[in-house]
């Protein structure tokens, strides 16, 4: 049984073959940008967490490799433990320098990098004062002046040495890159926004100050909002203009467009075989029931701005609960989806539902209030136009009212199929007409419905089912 998605396979010859988001065109645009830049630059590829940036970057990297570019993929988060990211970044360059003819050049790069200070300049005065606490005041001042002058000269000499080493480092690195490739070297930096603030800022500084040479193009794959939070955390102030600070390091900013929800949701539903839940062995079941479920998912994803990762999690969660129930009731996927939505975004209402704290009418009124308007848009079902949410909405009510005393759907309403005006519904909704309810009632599978607790017990088995995590 499938409960999680594997990373997309990236084919060597056709890296975007498994691209389900139609993003190859963006890779082509970005490739055209870097193809005409031999001076070196830093490009930020911005997208929200869970938007598929890493998959896109790896596909694009392979595309560039196929075009003859030398590329490096550096996961900054995985190297977060390294005190100075310069070490890891140079090591990545070394992976391209394995041939004998490059070894001397790479050795020179390492030698010069080793001379560059890896720690911040000490605060000379603080160091000296701490050293002399408790000494005679006159001697302390005298010693401080003498030692301060000596320490200052030492730091100035060190500064000159580091500046010279920095110039040599850039020259040797440029020579190595020029030997490695005639085209720009493309250096991808991924997961920067997941690093601790100190490491994230240090990576930016190293990219800008040490690797700013012709023929190297850096691609920073980031969630700009999260990276801005890291910068504020680094400086210890929410008043820092983090976006302005980032502009010092980034030459070109490219926002990865949001994916096509329709196409991606269809892919997810197909991959998780939701059609099998609706049809099973019943080939006569109306196909519109499945399309309504897809539309339900699509509307929720759109109104809550779910990321790709959240959409995956949502549908895997529905599948997990459904399969745990060990039943073939086709109304359950939509009902589970509705309950997960309520649990994730309206926890108080969800707890009232689980604990049966609401009257039938109060539950209907609360659902009317909290559900997005997009879910009440009407869509063709069989020969009728009914709201997208009609079936899960009424299913929830049926399951909610199924107790020892309310054992069947017929207890909730009485329907004369030849005359919907005789419909006797024991609740009112501002979004549904009596005819809507009659059409729902006619579609019901006859017989007793399980209790709602039968479904919610499986939902409660895992805290991982919260969509906003």
Tell me what each language-model feature is.
Residues 53:
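Conserved lysine of the Walker
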Residues 1-39, 43, 58-70, 98-99, ...:
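The feature marks long, low-complexity, polar/acidic/proline-rich intrinsically disordered regions embedded
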Residues 57-175:
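P-loop NTPase nucleotide-binding core
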Residues 75-78, 251-262:
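Conserved AAA+ ATPase "SRH/arginine-finger" region at the nucleotide-binding site
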Residues 43, 72, 185-187:
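Hydrophobic positions in the central parallel beta-sheet of the AAA+
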Residues 45, 49:
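The conserved Walker
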Residues 155-225, 234:
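Conserved Walker B catalytic segment
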Residues 227-248:
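Short regulatory helix/loop adjacent to the ATP-binding pocket of P-loop NTPases
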């Amino acid at each position: 049984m499938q409960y999680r998605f594997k990373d997309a396979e990236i084919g060597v010859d056709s890296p975007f073959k498994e691209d389900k988001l139609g993003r190859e065109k963006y890779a082509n645009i970005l490739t055209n940008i870097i193809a005409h830049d031999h001076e070196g630059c830093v490009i930020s590829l911005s997208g929200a967490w869970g938007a598929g940036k890493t998959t896109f970057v790896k596909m694009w990297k392979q595309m560039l490799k196929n075009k003859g570019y030398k590329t490096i993929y550096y996961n900054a988060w995985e190297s977060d433990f390294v005190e100075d990211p310069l070490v890891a970044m140079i090591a990545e360059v070394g992976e391209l320098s394995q041939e004998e003819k490059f070894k001397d050049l790479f050795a020179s790069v390492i030698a010069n990098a080793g001379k560059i200070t890896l720690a911040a300049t000490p605060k000379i005065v603080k160091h000296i004062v701490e050293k002399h606490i408790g000494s005679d005041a006159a001697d302390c001042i005298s010693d401080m002046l003498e030692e301060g002058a000596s320490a200052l000269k030492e730091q100035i000499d060190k500064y000159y040495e580091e500046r010279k080493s920095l110039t040599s480092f850039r020259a040797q690195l440029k020579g190595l890159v020029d030997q490695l490739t005639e085209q720009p070297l493309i250096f991808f930096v991924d997961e920067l926004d997941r690093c601790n603030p100190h490491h994230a800022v240090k990576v930016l500084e190293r990219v800008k100050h040490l690797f700013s040479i012709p023929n190297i193009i850096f691609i920073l794959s980031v969630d700009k909002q999260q990276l801005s939070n890291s910068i504020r955390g680094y400086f210890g102030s929410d008043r820092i203009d983090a976006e302005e600070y980032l502009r010092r390091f980034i030459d070109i900013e490219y926002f990865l467009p949001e994916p096509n929800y329709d196409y991606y949701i269809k892919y997810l539903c197909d991959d998780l075989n939701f059609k099998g839940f609706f049809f099973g062995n019943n080939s006569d079941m109306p196909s519109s029931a499945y399309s309504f479920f897809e539309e339900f998912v699509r509307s929720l994803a759109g109104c809550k701005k779910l990321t790709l990762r959240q959409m995956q999690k949502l549908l895997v969660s529905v599948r997990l609960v459904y399969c745990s129930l060990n039943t073939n009731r086709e109304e359950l996927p939509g009902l589970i989806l509705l309950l997960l939505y309520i649990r994730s975004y309206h926890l108080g209402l969800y707890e009232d539902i689980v604990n049966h704290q609401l009257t039938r009418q109060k539950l209907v009124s609360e659902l009317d209030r909290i559900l997005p308007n997009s879910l009440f848009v009407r869509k063709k079902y069989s020969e009728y136009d009914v709201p997208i949410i009609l079936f899960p909405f009424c299913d929830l009510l049926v399951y909610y009212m199924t107790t020892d005393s309310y054992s069947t759907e017929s207890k909730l309403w009485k329907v004369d199929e030849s005359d919907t005006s005789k419909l006797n519904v024991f609740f009112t909704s501002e979004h549904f007409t009596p005819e809507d309810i009659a059409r729902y009632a006619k579609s019901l599978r006859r017989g007793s419905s399980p209790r709602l607790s039968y479904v919610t017990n499986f939902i409660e088995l895992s805290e991982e089912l919260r969509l906003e995590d």
